[in-house]
């Protein structure tokens, strides 16, 4: 019976094994045939895949309102709906709006847009927008939350790119393939390789036992990030099957994946895996490191020579044939003390050794092509390799045949003026960063599941204008901020509020909340505590080391007075203030921050350590002038915080409140 049972069981196992192979073959056949059946031509009819056009300015009735071309497109839609634009905002309100838009800080007396964009704070403000999109973080997250101790160099690269108004098409190319570009000099080379941190910053399962799966997961994350960031397409959806909505077959996904398979992102895939980093040190810094290594090596020789001498003397004195397993147990106190002194010197030299600057980034590997993996399973590869190529919905280019990865060709294709998506996607992002909602509300998805543009002609006009003006973000900002559309008040007419409650037609300026970073920075600025040093890092974690200790406690501190941009962004454990005020998930692309209203926000603004520290500093400033009356002090405080004098009622209530603390003015204020 046992033998019969075994045979039945074995027969069942073999049948299931055969069925599994048949199933895999059928799935593979279906996947390959489906890839050929997707109608790329029909899919190209989607609005986002149409070539850019430059529509004529609409004819409007109210010819005195438009200040620049933007206003014609907005006003035409308003007039079509029977609505009128809101009146212009007063200068004080407009100044506040513009300063937060360009600098992320409370307004000063500067009114010139060009001068505001020439401040170093401009690059810091706009870099943070881009860092949302590229899922910037100072740690890996996921299973092994290792420190990205050199990620800050990419962050500083982005700050410098916005401050220098690097053309956006060049900005894109450098992030995808900076290491493949010809550098003007050594400084420029370091900048270019640092830019490729864009591809390396994503979260990775560093302890994944299946190395092929780990690599394909990393490639998938790169494709997903690249697609959403620059093209507004969810390319990653085609990994396991043809895209359910957009005309992107699985074959196109693996053709693109071959480019990143040919790119070296990781130094090692062994547990725990380590990402690749590019050297960004100067010849002088290299010599400093070599000198440190020489001193360390020399000290090790001193220790070895002294230990050998002591051991030889030990053999002679003790008349031993050989040393015991632990000869140090036989050392005298004086010998032990001398060895400890030598080892302390070694530790000091090692701790003071010059660390060579490195930057997260990628480099080219061996040119490789991939087959389709059925359902994304690398254990079920098709026999046919997919030549490296760009998505066919947007390109009729021939497959890549060179010995390089193809990243440079990919970057040039993405930034080609004939590509209908790249310029549309970035001008839409800039619009969203100013108005709180993009002309296409789904900023990261221009595919069939994304929303249609509210003002399609304006979107195309801006995209064409942007390209013709050298892909300049600063020029685009100036165009938008100079428009009558941007300068309206935020309260509309009763009719507009009723017929356009969501303000999709932009009959009024949108009400905008301060994000977490400008909120924090403003508190420090008003308290006179903000450290405006630009660039560098404040984090002290060693590269690749876990940011959590053995008790799962994160020792990261956020007490610095530097701008919020420079505070560590820890995946799986975002700073409380950031999290409280809707900081995006740093593990995914996010070009569209959300707004929430929750009780802890009010509690934070009442009694958090940051609030107590900054209000105490402001109080000391107010009380320092003994000549001021309570009324004058209240007026000064209002102007400092709100950039306006208090109303009569506000003044009356504030004076009455602080008057109750005559014996303890510090507490009252």
Stretches with model-predicted labels:
Residues 34, 59, 214-226, 330-333, ...:
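Electrostatic cytochrome c docking/interface patches
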Residues 62-97, 101-122, 129, 135-184, ...:
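Primarily short, surface-exposed interaction patches in extracytoplasmic proteins
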């Amino acid at each position: 019976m046992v033998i019969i049972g075994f045979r039945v069981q074995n027969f069942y196992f073999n049948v299931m094994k055969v069925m599994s192979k048949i199933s895999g073959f059928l799935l593979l056949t279906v996947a390959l045939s489906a890839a050929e059946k997707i109608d790329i031509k029909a899919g190209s009819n989607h609005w986002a895949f149409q070539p850019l056009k430059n529509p004529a300015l609409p004819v409007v009735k109210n010819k005195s309102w438009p200040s620049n071309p933007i206003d014609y497109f907005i006003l035409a839609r308003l007039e079509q709906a029977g609505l009128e634009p809101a009146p212009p905002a007063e200068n004080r309100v407009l100044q506040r709006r513009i300063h937060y838009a360009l600098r992320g800080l409370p307004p000063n007396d500067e009114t010139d847009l060009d001068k505001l964009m020439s401040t170093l704070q401009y690059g810091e403000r706009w870099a943070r927008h881009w860092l949302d999109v590229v899922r910037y973080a100072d740690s890996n997250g996921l299973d092994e939350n290792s420190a990205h101790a050199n990620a800050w160099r990419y962050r500083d690269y982005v700050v410098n790119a916005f401050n220098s108004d690097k053309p956006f098409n060049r900005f894109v190319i450098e992030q995808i393939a900076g290491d493949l570009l010809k550098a003007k000099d050594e400084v420029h080379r370091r900048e270019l390789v640092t830019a490729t941190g864009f591809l390396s910053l994503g979260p990775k399962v560093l302890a994944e036992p299946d190395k092929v799966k780990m690599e394909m997961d990393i490639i998938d994350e790169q494709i997903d990030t690249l697609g959403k960031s620059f093209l507004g397409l969810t390319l990653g959806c085609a990994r396991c099957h043809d895209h359910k909505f957009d005309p992107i077959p699985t074959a196109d996904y693996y053709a693109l994946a071959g480019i990143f398979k040919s790119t070296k992102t990781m130094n090692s895939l062994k547990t725990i895996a380590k990402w690749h980093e590019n050297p960004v040190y100067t010849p002088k810094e290299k010599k400093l490191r070599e000198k440190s290594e020489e001193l360390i090596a020399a000290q090790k020789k001193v220790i070895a020579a002294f230990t050998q001498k002591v051991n030889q003397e030990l053999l002679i004195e003790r008349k031993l044939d050989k040393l015991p397993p632990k000869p140090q147990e036989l050392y005298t106190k004086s010998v032990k003390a001398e060895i400890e002194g030598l080892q302390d010197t070694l530790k000091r030299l090692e701790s003071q050794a010059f660390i060579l600057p490195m930057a997260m980034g990628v480099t080219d590997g061996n040119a490789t092509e991939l087959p389709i993996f059925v359902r994304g399973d690398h254990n079920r590869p098709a026999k046919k390799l997919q030549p490296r190529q760009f998505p066919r919905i947007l390109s009729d280019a021939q497959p890549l045949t060179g010995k390089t990865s193809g990243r440079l060709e990919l970057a040039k294709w993405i930034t080609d003026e004939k590509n209908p998506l790249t310029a549309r996607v970035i001008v839409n992002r800039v619009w969203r960063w100013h108005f709180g909602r993009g002309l296409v509300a789904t900023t990261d998805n221009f595919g069939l599941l994304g929303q249609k543009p509210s003002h399609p002609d304006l979107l195309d006009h801006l995209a064409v204008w942007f390209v013709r003006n050298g892909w300049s973000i600063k020029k685009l900002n100036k165009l938008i901020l100079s428009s009558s559309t941007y300068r309206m008040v935020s309260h509309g007419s009763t009719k507009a509020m009723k017929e356009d409650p969501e303000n999709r037609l932009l009959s009024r300026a949108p009400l905008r909340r301060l994000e977490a970073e400008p909120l924090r920075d403003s508190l420090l600025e008003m308290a006179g505590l903000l450290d405006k040093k630009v660039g560098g890092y404040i984090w002290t974690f060693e590269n690749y080391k876990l940011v959590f200790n053995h008790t799962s406690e994160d020792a990261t501190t956020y007490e610095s007075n530097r701008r919020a941009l420079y505070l560590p962004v820890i995946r799986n454990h975002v700073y409380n203030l950031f999290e409280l005020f809707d900081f995006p998930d740093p593990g995914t692309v996010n070009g569209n921050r959300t707004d929430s209203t929750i009780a802890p926000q009010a509690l934070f603004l009442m009694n958090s350590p940051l609030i107590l520290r900054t209000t105490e500093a402001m109080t000391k400033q107010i009380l320092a002038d003994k000549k001021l009356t309570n009324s004058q002090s209240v007026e000064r405080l209002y102007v400092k915080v709100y950039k306006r004098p208090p109303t009569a009622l506000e003044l009356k209530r504030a004076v009455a409140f602080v008057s109750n603390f005559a014996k303890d003015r510090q507490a009252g204020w």
